[in-house]
Amino acid sequence: MNKLLCCALVFLDISIKWTTQETFPPKYLHYDPESSRQLMCDKCPPGTFLKQPCTARRKTVCAPCPDHYYTDTWHTSDECLYCSPVCKELQYVKQECSRTHNRVCECEEGRYLELEFCLKHRSCPPGFGVLHPGTPERNTVCKRCPDGFFSNETSSKAPCRKHTNCSAFGLLLTQKGNATHDNICSGSSESSTHKCGIDMTLCEEAFFRFAVPTKLTPNWLSVLVDNLPGTKVNAESIERIKQRHNSREQTFQLLKLWKHQNKDQDMVKKIIQDIDLCENSVRRHIGHLNLTFEQLLKLMESLPGKKVTTEDVEKTVKTCKSSEQLLKLLSLWRIKNGDQDTRKGLLHALKHLKTYHFPKTVIQSLKKTIRFLHSFTMYRLYRKLFLEMIGNQVQSLKISCL
C-alpha cells in the first residue's frame, strides 16, 4: 500500500512539473471538434487577440488589437481590453496607451493617489523628520526625531538632522538642542566668519572671467603676465597653471594668483573695494533667501559636474550665517569643478530646479544674480579696473581677439 502511494505521489509530481514547465510560445489545452482531440495550442502574444484557435492542421491565429485596445500578457482571449480613459485631475500620463499596455496615470510631483483623488503629501512638522518620502502611490511617513537629532522646519522631504557637535568645530556647547532645535555653540558668529571663508566670490570670478578673450592667441597668457603690475607670478606657478587647466581657465587662475600675491598693493585694494560693492548687489539678490537645508541640498544636486556632498552642506549650514550659506556652497562647487564657470553652472541648475517645484522667489532671485554677473555693470567695472590698470597694449590684444 505504501509502495503504491509513493508511486502515485511521484507520478503526480512529474505531471505537475510537466504541466507547469515553461515553453515558448506558451501553450494551452484546446478541444478540437474536427479531430475530437485535446490539442496544445499556442497562446496569443501581448498586443493581439485570439482570432482562431489551432486545429490539427493549423496553428493558432492571432490578430492585432485595434486602436485604444490592448493586451499585456500571453493569453487565450478572443478580445482585447479597452484602455483606461484620460487621466484624472492632478494626474499626468506616465505611459500612453498602446497595443501592449494600458494607459498609466500618475499623480503629479508632491501628491499621491488615495482612492480616486491625488492628495498632497503630508509635511512633517518641526520635531518630526521624514522616515519614508512620499511617492505617487503612498503618503509621506513621519517619525519623531530621536535623542540627538532635530528638525526645525515643516517639510515633506527633510529627515531629522543630527545635533551639531560643537567640539568638532572648536566651540563650546552653550545650550543643548532638542527635537526642534539644534545645539547652540558659543562663539558661533565669530568662528563662523572665520570658518566660512569663501575662496572666491561670485563677483571676483565674473570680473576675472571678463579678462578672458573670446578667441585666445597662443601668447595671450605671456602678454598678460608681462603687463600685470606689482609682484610677478613666477614661472613655476605659470607652468603649473598651464598643466592643470584648459586655455580659457588659465587666465582666470593666473589673475586669482596675482591678486593673492598683491593683496597689499593699492591697485588690488581698489579692485577689492569695487568688488565688495558688487558683492553687496549680489547679496541683495540672494542673501535674504534663507534657504532650508533641503533646498540647499537640492540646488547643489542640480549643479553639473562633481557634487557638493551632503556633509559639506551640513557643515556650511552649521558654520555660516544664512546670508552666506549659498555663496559658500557655490564656492565649494567651483573648487570641486576646477574649470567650470559658476554662472553657467547656475544656468544649468535653473533648468532642473523648475521640475522640483522650487520656490519661484528663489528662482527669480537666482536669475537676477546671473543676469547681473553678466551685465554691462560688470563689463564697466572690468574696463575701469582691469584695462586701465594693465595698459593699452593688452587692451588692443584682447580687442583684436574678440
Curated annotation (Swiss-Prot):
Per the UniProt entry, the signal peptide is 1-21
Q: Say which species the protein is native to.
A: Bos taurus
Q: Which GO terms describe its biological process?
A: apoptotic process; extracellular matrix organization; negative regulation of odontogenesis of dentin-containing tooth; negative regulation of osteoclast differentiation; negative regulation of tumor necrosis factor-mediated signaling pathway; signal transduction
Gene3D superfamilies given for it? Death Domain, Fas, Tumor Necrosis Factor Receptor, subunit A, domain 2
State which gene encodes it. Answer: TNFRSF11B
- Does this UniProt record's set of keywords contain Aminoacyl-tRNA synthetase? no
Q: Which UniProt keywords apply?
A: Apoptosis, Disulfide bond, Glycoprotein, Receptor, Repeat, Secreted, Signal
- In the UniProt record, does the keyword Glycoprotein occur? yes
Where is the site labelled Involved in dimerization?
Answer: 401
All copies of the Death domain together span 198-269, 270-365
**Subunit details for this protein?**
Homodimer. Interacts with TNFSF10 and TNFSF11.
Provide the disulphide bond pattern: 41-54, 44-62, 65-80, 83-97, 87-105, 107-118, 124-142, 145-160, 166-185
Q: What is this protein called?
A: Tumor necrosis factor receptor superfamily member 11B
Q: Where are the transmembrane segments?
A: none
InterPro entries given in the database record: DEATH-like_dom_sf, Death_dom, TNFR/NGFR_Cys_rich_reg, TNFR_11, TNFR_11B, TNFRSF_decoy_receptor
Q: Give residue ranges of the TNFR-Cys repeats.
A: 24-62, 64-105, 106-142, 144-185
State the compartments where it is located.
Secreted
| Described purpose of this protein according to its UniProt entry | Acts as a decoy receptor for TNFSF11/RANKL and thereby neutralizes its function in osteoclastogenesis. Inhibits the activation of osteoclasts and promotes osteoclast apoptosis. Bone homeostasis seems to depend on the local ratio between TNFSF11 and TNFRSF11B. May also play a role in preventing arterial calcification. May act as decoy receptor for TNFSF10/TRAIL and protect against apoptosis. TNFSF10/TRAIL binding blocks the inhibition of osteoclastogenesis.
GO MF annotation list: heparan sulfate binding
